[in-house]
């Protein structure tokens, strides 16, 4: 099994060959040497995974996460995520669902969203969708929706609100698409 070492709120895959394997599986993580590799062979340095990616890959038995020289279980990794990342439970729920639907899911932070999702791959296409995760119990105003929409419109991406019922982990997706009339 591939090992990654937890460093704060990230997990480092030090072995470059293993980093290439993980990246090849679904464009997980960010290599230290290049922003958007076109292929796993472009990776020449270690790979950094977010805690969300690491938990997903750990649950899939693809990686094991090491802390202080010992393998940690998924429950502890989840707890570390909850302690270090605001809205971790909500974000992980959406991330896992999108990955299970076979999307390539990357951080959407630079776009003001939670995730950017690709149908092909980063580096080979621009992300067609931005995703914002919202708890079903959370109230949002029309102005907030307009704000979300402005971000997606200015970057020419479709906006998807993922509305999560935390009790049963169900998710409803609503897509906003700008039209020129």
Curated annotation (Swiss-Prot):
One Gene Ontology cellular component annotation?
A: cytoplasm
Which is an annotated Pfam family here?
tRNA_int_endo_N
Superkingdom, natural source: Archaea
Q: Which GO terms describe its molecular function?
A: lyase activity; nucleic acid binding; tRNA-intron endonuclease activity
Q: Which reaction does it catalyse?
A: pretRNA = a 3'-half-tRNA molecule with a 5'-OH end + a 5'-half-tRNA molecule with a 2',3'-cyclic phosphate end + an intron with a 2',3'-cyclic phosphate and a 5'-hydroxyl terminus
Q: Cross-referenced SUPFAM superfamilies, in alphabetical order?
A: tRNA-intron endonuclease catalytic domain-like (SSF53032), tRNA-intron endonuclease N-terminal domain-like (SSF55267)
- Family matches, as Gene3D superfamilies: 3.40.1350.10, tRNA intron endonuclease, N-terminal domain (3.40.1170.20)
* TM spans (from-to): none
The GO annotation for biological process reads: tRNA splicing, via endonucleolytic cleavage and ligation
Q: What is its EC number?
A: 4.6.1.16
Group of enzyme by EC:
lyase
- Which keywords does the record carry? Lyase, tRNA processing
- Which residues act catalytically here? 118, 126, 157
Function, as annotated: Endonuclease that removes tRNA introns. Cleaves pre-tRNA at the 5'- and 3'-splice sites to release the intron. The products are an intron and two tRNA half-molecules bearing 2',3' cyclic phosphate and 5'-OH termini. Recognizes a pseudosymmetric substrate in which 2 bulged loops of 3 bases are separated by a stem of 4 bp.
The record's similarity note reads:
Belongs to the tRNA-intron endonuclease family. Archaeal short subfamily.
Record's subunit section: Homotetramer; although the tetramer contains four active sites, only two participate in the cleavage. Therefore, it should be considered as a dimer of dimers.
Read off the PANTHER family from this record.
Answer: TRNA-SPLICING ENDONUCLEASE SUBUNIT SEN2 (PTHR21227:SF0)
Q: What is this protein called?
A: tRNA-splicing endonuclease
Species of provenance = Sulfolobus acidocaldarius (strain ATCC 33909 / DSM 639 / JCM 8929 / NBRC 15157 / NCIMB 11770)
């Amino acid at each position: 099994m591939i090992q990654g070492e937890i460093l704060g709120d990230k997990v480092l895959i030090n072995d470059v060959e293993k980093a290439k394997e993980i990246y090849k599986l679904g464009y997980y993580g960010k290599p230290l040497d290049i922003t958007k590799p076109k292929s796993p062979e472009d990776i020449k340095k270690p790979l950094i995974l977010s805690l969300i990616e690491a938990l997903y890959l750990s649950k899939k038995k693809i990686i094991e996460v090491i802390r202080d020289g010992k393998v940690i279980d998924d429950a502890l990794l989840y707890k570390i995520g909850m302690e270090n990342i605001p809205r971790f439970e909500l974000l992980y729920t959406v991330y896992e669902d999108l990955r299970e639907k076979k999307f390539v899911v990357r951080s959407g932070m630079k776009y003001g969203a939670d995730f950017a999702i690709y149908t092909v791959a980063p580096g080979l296409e621009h992300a067609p969708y931005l995703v914002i995760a919202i708890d079903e119990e959370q109230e949002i105003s029309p102005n907030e929706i307009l704000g979300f929409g402005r971000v997606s419109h200015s970057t020419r991406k479709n906006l998807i609100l993922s509305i999560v019922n935390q009790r049963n982990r169900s998710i409803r997706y609503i897509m906003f698409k700008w039209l020129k009339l």
